[in-house]
């Protein structure tokens, strides 16, 4: 009986440590995707100049690998996929899905256009304006126990085959790599959400004249 009580006391004593170890191992486990948190801008945009638009995302990165050598050593199971997480009020499940990079950009820009009351249409008509997003940089690095993320893209408003106006957006961030915690997604999300919302879509569409 005494041995049983001693065994129970030892379990109670070391249980928190065991739980912490299991949590740490679970947190350290590499995933096949990077979590990307995105929130639509709180400010409602002005009434758009158009109600329909085409949307195109192209990959113009010089380096198509989103991870540096050192970052890939940490994220060994990453398969070029991104879990898009959105948590607007009133929704139970914030996870939109897991996408490749191009689809990730398409999804969030569709959300922004939808928020503005603009319908994204699949059309070959030159009369319908097109928002073309060219991803130029998307790079996650890990150096000296810090995550570094850089991102850039160029948005162009195209109509009748002509580029009417364009806006270049870029930025970067860094975050300490805390042992036992995967901060890669947090580092990416901080820059990604900010830069997506930096694009002034209303201003781009404002370049369309009534005649166009």
Task: Please describe what each predicted stretch is.
Residues 73-78, 150-155, 186-188:
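Short, low-complexity, polar/charged sequence segments that are solvent-exposed and flexible
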Residues 30-40, 115-165, 174-176:
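Surface-exposed short loop/turn segments
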Residues 57-62, 134-139, 170-172:
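Generic short beta-strand segments
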Residues 28-102, 204-212:
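A structural "domain/chain start" motif
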């Amino acid at each position: 009986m005494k041995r049983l009580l001693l065994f129970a006391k030892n379990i109670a004593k070391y249980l928190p440590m065991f739980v912490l170890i299991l949590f740490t191992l679970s947190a350290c486990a590499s995933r096949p995707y990077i979590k990307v948190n995105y929130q639509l801008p709180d400010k409602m945009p002005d009434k758009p100049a158009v109600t329909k638009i085409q949307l195109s995302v192209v990959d113009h990165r010089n380096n198509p690998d989103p991870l540096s050598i050192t970052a890939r050593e940490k994220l060994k199971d990453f398969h070029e996929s991104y879990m898009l997480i959105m948590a607007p009020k009133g929704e139970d499940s914030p996870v939109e899905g897991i996408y490749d990079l191009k689809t990730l950009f398409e999804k969030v820009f569709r959300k922004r256009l939808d928020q503005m009351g603009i319908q994204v249409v699949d059309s070959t008509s030159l009369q319908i304006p097109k928002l073309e997003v060219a991803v130029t940089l998307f790079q996650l690095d890990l150096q000296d126990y810090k995550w570094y993320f850089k991102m850039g893209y160029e948005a162009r408003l195209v109509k009748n085959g002509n580029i009417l106006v364009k806006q270049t957006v870029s930025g970067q961030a860094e975050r300490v790599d805390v042992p036992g915690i995967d901060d890669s997604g947090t580092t990416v999300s901080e820059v990604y959400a900010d830069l997506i919302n930096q694009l002034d879509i209303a201003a781009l569409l404002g370049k369309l004249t009534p005649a166009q």
